[in-house]
A protein has these predicted regions:
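Charged, compositionally biased N-terminal leader segments and the immediate start
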Residues: 1-41
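Alpha/beta enzyme core
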Residues: 30-41, 52-84, 93-244, 250-281, ...
């Protein structure tokens, strides 16, 4: 229904002011901080998307995905028996089989997510995008992170964008689909809102801010606009769509701020791995350092924490 987006206007100054207020929020402390950080861990898509990825470093990542926080630290927080893991492991299609096998080896049912559809640029013929998605699913990916064609957004080809995402959704089959908008390359916040709505209308299970490869990745103004779109879509259809900020989320405070923003904009029901993810490669390390400090009262040295 293109009528939903034809008259969209985003008050950029108001959005930016709201984002500035978010940055000034006082962070939680003590046990509350530890609880929020453990919640963040369960929402992380632990990611490696490098040209030099190998079966060995993917295997280490998968082990860390199952054991994100040191066992003795979890025992000190009385959380050792809660089965805390990250939400998913995210890799390139060529590394999906490595990740699936590594997780099986440690008896872990964490889903493997694969980027696809011409990631990160989206400058790939649709036939190739669909074939890549199907291969990733065939290899064992249970979640697919596609990336949209920014060209279709910037030239206002909304029906073509809808059709491309719809075909990607069809190619995913039973796998969940997250649609990456690459918001830093969409030109304006109105386009972010419109692309969000089109992606949801086409069947996306999640909408995601960024590939992590753009100059500008997950920002609070973009997050506010995308979450308002999710809320509007829910009011119109009754369907809940997930939200995933990704790129540049490196610190424990970043994670807590995103969690608090989701709670304010969408409500506590979105604070689950089924509806909220954090795309990150280095975030988990900082979270574990903060939990180490909370439990021991001292800063973690390099040898204190396992490498991912």
């Amino acid at each position: 229904e293109l009528g939903w987006i034809s008259k969209v206007h985003v008050n950029r100054p108001a959005v930016v002011r709201h984002a500035e207020q978010i940055k000034k929020w006082r962070t939680v402390k003590g046990n509350w901080q530890a609880a929020w950080l453990l919640k963040a861990v369960t929402c992380i898509d632990l990611t490696t998307l490098s040209g030099d990825d190998t079966p060995s470093n993917v295997g280490r990542l998968c082990f860390k995905a199952k054991h994100p926080i040191r066992e003795d630290l979890l025992k000190a927080l009385d959380m050792h028996d809660k089965g805390i893991t990250v939400a998913a492991v995210c890799v390139y299609p060529a590394r999906v089989t490595d990740a699936v096998n590594a997780l099986k080896a440690v008896a872990c049912n964490i889903p493997v997510a694969s980027v696809a559809a011409g990631f990160p640029s989206g400058q790939t013929p649709l036939e190739i995008k669909l074939a890549e998605i199907k291969l990733a699913v065939q290899y064992g990916a249970r979640e697919i992170d596609i990336v949209i064609s920014r060209t279709l957004v910037l030239t206002g080809q909304w029906e073509d964008l809808y059709e491309e995402i719809r075909q990607c959704r069809e190619a995913c089959g039973e796998a969940h689909m997250k649609t990456i908008l690459a918001t830093g390359e969409l030109g304006c916040l109105a386009n972010v809102y419109k692309a969000s709505m089109i992606a949801m209308m086409a069947g996306s299970d999640f909408i995601k801010t960024s590939t992590g490869k753009e100059v500008e990745n997950a920002t609070f103004p973009v997050g506010v606009v995308m979450m308002r779109a999710i809320k509007d879509f829910y009011w119109q259809t009754g369907n809940k769509v997930g939200f995933k900020p990704a790129g540049g989320i490196r610190t424990a405070n970043d994670a807590i701020t995103w969690l608090m923003l989701v709670k304010e904009e969408l409500g506590v029901e979105w604070l689950t791995p089924e509806l909220f993810r954090l795309g990150a490669s280095s975030l988990l390390e900082d979270i574990e350092k903060q939990i180490f400090y909370h439990v021991t009262g001292s800063c973690a040295l390099q040898h204190d924490l396992a490498m991912a």
